[in-house]
Amino acid sequence: MVSIRDFTMPKKFVQMLVFNLTLTEVVLSGNVLIWPTDGSHWLNIKIILEELIQRNHNVTVLASSATLFINSNPDSPVNFEVIPVSYKKSNIDSLIEHMIMLWIDHRPTPLTIWAFYKELGKLLDTFFQINIQLCDGVLKNPKLMARLQKGGFDVLVADPVTICGDLVALKLGIPFMYTLRFSPASTVERHCGKIPAPVSYVPAALSELTDQMTFGERIKNTISYSLQDYIFQSYWGEWNSYYSKILGRPTTLCETMGKAEIWLIRTYWDFEFPRPYLPNFEFVGGLHCKPAKPLPKEMEEFIQSSGKNGVVVFSLGSMVKNLTEEKANLIASALAQIPQKVLWRYKGKKPATLGNNTQLFDWIPQNDLLGHPKTKAFITHGGTNGIYEAIYHGVPMVGVPMFADQPDNIAHMKAKGAAVEVNLNTMTSVDLLSALRTVINEPSYKENAMRLSRIHHDQPVKPLDRAVFWIEFVMRHKGAKHLRVAAHDLTWFQYHSLDVIGFLLVCVTTAIFLVIQCCLFSCQKFGKIGKKKKRE
């Protein structure tokens, strides 16, 4: 016979287990504040915050009243704090358009570099004025700051392209961390994050170089680092004053950025060249990539009609609205000559030379198309998001880079044998056709793309899980100071051991001087003795 006590013990055990699980859930649930950057950057951080919500965290996004992609939805589980600003969406659109056209018309070369940076300086000044409004909209808004103080946030995750997230975190007294793709020549990562970057084999971001450099390329690399350092130091001047004013003490933007607990870098070793890095730098490239989903019926039927030839996916990203009529006709003419069907994301006027094998779409499910077994190639502008989707699914690329990191991204893919590049400004229909035939017909491009895909998938932890882990880690431990290198506490001459080198040089010089003096003294002494003996 079974006693009542035998049932009571398991019941108490179950109650205790449920209580512990509930307590654990409460402990692990945190409050995360997001300081994003608009555009394609938002697409990455949006994936992170969606995963945080899935893990029972509360997420609040600070967004301006004039954004392109960051739209608050009443039904969304995300909380949005809208920052009032005087500029409009049209101002942001205009700034991005000017940036794209500057890069297309004056892509940095030895002949155009000064004209390029002169115009870039004007755009940076405009961006500074917009960014300052965003900062003031939070830091000089007592009501908003009071609400944020009451929010009980555990961590702030910021995209440093939009400056001030770190400043907001310091004013709230909470740890902060960054999520970023890069800064030109890794200037921010080197000077503020203290990551090592030997110029002999670490190519400067935007230099379009690889880790295998000739003597001439190493000269170019050294100049690239120095030039970007100069530009950033000039740009940081105004921010240094602003940061000092807000914090009420002398400081710099870079010193403040150096307080970041973790840097989530949106690349990985399938893309990057081997280089040294620090324990608080985590590579999470491709965190937005997912297995392909079924396509809309009409799109699937169009793809299936391609037969064994397959399809080509063509997209120049979300930032490029359309091309000139001449350029669109040139591209359409090349696409019409390949046996594959083409899905082209394009919003401009229908090209007169458009072939029967090509369909235009205002929007395409890019990730799902790249994951389709009939996809043979991807024509891309070289944005990091698109490149990682191609890596994830093992699709070779034809790069048509236009601005920012795109030329550098395509240079990485070319070096790894997974892409061919064509120049948007100078390409002909024959150039594009030749590039397409190369990546489709030469097996090495598909093989290299699949090799990168295998590397990407063969990770102990998925990129998204790794990113979220480190956010939760900072919340659990109130920071990650144990991963912060002592380089942050050194002056520039201590960091480069110039004081030690100087001391040793003085010691060696003194020793050499004393040896010489001893030799001279000995020579004089023995010389006098010799002369005295001769006289005797």
Curated annotation (Swiss-Prot):
Q: Name one GO biological process term.
A: bile acid metabolic process
Q: Per the record's keyword annotation, is Glycoprotein included, yes or no?
A: yes
Give the Pfam families listed for this entry. Answer: UDPGT (PF00201)
A single GO molecular function term of this UniProt record: glucuronosyltransferase activity
This entry carries the following GO cellular component terms, namely: endoplasmic reticulum membrane
Q: Which SUPFAM superfamilies match?
A: UDP-Glycosyltransferase/glycogen phosphorylase
The catalytic activity, as recorded, is: glucuronate acceptor + UDP-alpha-D-glucuronate = acceptor beta-D-glucuronoside + UDP + H(+); 17alpha-estradiol + UDP-alpha-D-glucuronate = 17alpha-estradiol 3-O-(beta-D-glucuronate) + UDP + H(+); 17beta-estradiol + UDP-alpha-D-glucuronate = 17beta-estradiol 3-O-(beta-D-glucuronate) + UDP + H(+); chenodeoxycholate + UDP-alpha-D-glucuronate = chenodeoxycholoyl-24-O-(beta-D-glucuronate) + UDP
Q: Name the keywords, alphabetized.
A: Endoplasmic reticulum, Glycoprotein, Glycosyltransferase, Lipid metabolism, Membrane, Transferase, Transmembrane, Transmembrane helix
List where in the cell it is found.
Endoplasmic reticulum membrane
State which tissues express it.
Mainly expressed in the nasal mucosa.
Q: What class of enzyme is it?
A: transferase
Q: What does this protein do?
A: UDP-glucuronosyltransferase (UGT) that catalyzes phase II biotransformation reactions in which lipophilic substrates are conjugated with glucuronic acid to increase the metabolite's water solubility, thereby facilitating excretion into either the urine or bile. Essential for the elimination and detoxification of drugs, xenobiotics and endogenous compounds. Catalyzes the glucuronidation of endogenous estrogen hormone estradiol. Contributes to bile acid (BA) detoxification by catalyzing the glucuronidation of BA substrates, which are natural detergents for dietary lipids absorption.
Q: Spell out the note in the miscellaneous section.
A: UGT2A2 isoform is part of the UGT2A complex locus which displays alternative use of promoters and exons. The locus is defined by 2 alternative promoters resulting in 2 functionally active polypeptides UGT2A1 and UGT2A2. Alternative splicing of exons results in additional isoforms for each protein class.
The protein depicted here goes by the name UDP-glucuronosyltransferase 2A2
What taxonomic lineage is listed for the species of origin? Eukaryota, Metazoa, Chordata, Craniata, Vertebrata
